[in-house]
């Protein structure tokens, strides 16, 4: 599970992209997801600092910086890989 802030978590294996919300394409993506009912706002009223795109086409807004989420994502993936490669010594 990937912590996206304020007690909210998402399944890390379902994350397709972690992007910054400042660009026009990301603003359009957010607006289209809202119209389609696929937008999840996990900012708790704070400024959106990252957008997560999921494999189900859901778009999740987070108040945590995209770089921070990317580091957390990498740590989760690394921890998972260590757990799956337990070879006897």
Curated annotation (Swiss-Prot):
One Pfam family per UniProt: RemA-like
Superkingdom of origin organism: Bacteria
InterPro entries: RemA-like (IPR007169)
Protein family: Belongs to the RemA family.
PANTHER family linked to this entry: REGULATORY PROTEIN SSL2874-RELATED, REGULATORY PROTEIN TM_1690-RELATED
Protein name: Putative regulatory protein Dalk_1931
Organism: Desulfatibacillum aliphaticivorans
